[in-house]
């Protein structure tokens, strides 16, 4: 008798759910957020970021953030000019941008570029990116160590001016390097962000770049997010803090 009563109550409950438009097998569906698709157009300053999936891992460790997928058109020694002059064949930067499979295109020029070579190609790439419905981020790397500090200052000046002109975010990595170095850096401090050739970023420098790119794209704070195991925890924290502080300063400068 008791079992019949329980079954009767269950039937009434299921009937009520159906009458109210709720199916018994309905369950909340957890939607996976759409990834942010990022194309890096650059040269040998970028491979460590791509190879180590630094941007993807930052996003994965950031609770509530969208995942990131990264593609690259990366050629050793390339400039924006050489990327543009490569034309529109398969695998070129222009072809990849025009394919429209991206949300952001990060443009990185060669370390020793001067304004007459930088400005027209930054503008042309920006126009193509905008026409395709994508968003541009200008990535100003640090210069080579032997060009410190003048080359760093040149990179900062050019990218800030172009960022203001085009109304796009910039990754002002040269200023972040200055911030990390401090007022009177030792040789060891200066070399710590570079590879052994003192021209390309080492693991620490690449991670600083990645944190800045992440913040420029997402406007999110990288402090406390994932870092390569080979970077000591205290150094990773300092690099994250440096990236976030510089991102905020640069974002404010672009509005002036």
Specify the residue positions occupied by each region the protein language model found.
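Bacterial N-terminal signal peptides that target proteins for export
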Residues: 1-10
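Conserved catalytic region of serine esterases and O-acyltransferases that act on ester linkages
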Residues: 200, 210-256
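Boundary at the C-terminal end of the N-terminal hydrophobic targeting segment
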Residues: 22-26
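Conserved SGNH/GDSL esterase-like catalytic core that processes O-acyl groups on lipids
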Residues: 35-40, 45-121
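Alpha-helical cap/lid subdomain in secreted, periplasmic
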Residues: 93-203, 207, 211, 215-216, ...
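Bacterial N-terminal signal peptides
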Residues: 9-18
């Amino acid at each position: 008798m008791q079992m019949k009563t329980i079954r009767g109550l269950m039937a009434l409950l299921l009937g009520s759910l159906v009458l109210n438009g709720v199916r018994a097998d309905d369950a909340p569906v957890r939607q996976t957020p759409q990834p942010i698709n990022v194309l890096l157009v650059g040269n040998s300053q970028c491979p460590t970021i791509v190879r180590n999936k630094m941007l993807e891992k930052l996003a994965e460790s950031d609770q509530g953030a969208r995942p990131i997928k990264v593609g690259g058109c990366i050629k050793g020694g390339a400039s924006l000019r050489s990327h543009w002059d490569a034309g529109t064949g398969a695998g070129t930067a222009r072809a990849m941008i025009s394919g429209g499979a991206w949300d952001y295109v990060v443009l990185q020029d060669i370390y020793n570029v001067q304004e007459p070579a930088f400005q027209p190609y930054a503008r042309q790439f920006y126009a193509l990116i905008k026409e395709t419905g994508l968003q541009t981020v200008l990535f100003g790397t640090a210069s080579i160590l032997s060009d410190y500090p003048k080359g760093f200052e040149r990179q900062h000046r050019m990218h800030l001016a172009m960022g203001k002109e085009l109304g796009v975010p910039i990754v002002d990595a040269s200023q972040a390097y200055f911030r990390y170095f401090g007022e009177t850096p030792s040789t060891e401090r200066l070399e710590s962000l570079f590879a052994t050739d003192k021209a390309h970023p080492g693991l620490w420098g690449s991670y600083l770049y990645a944190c800045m790119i992440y913040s420029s794209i997402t406007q999110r704070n990288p402090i406390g997010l994932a870092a390569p195991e080979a970077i000591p925890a205290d150094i990773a924290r300092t690099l994250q803090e440096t990236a976030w502080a510089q991102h905020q300063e640069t974002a404010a400068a672009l509005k002036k």
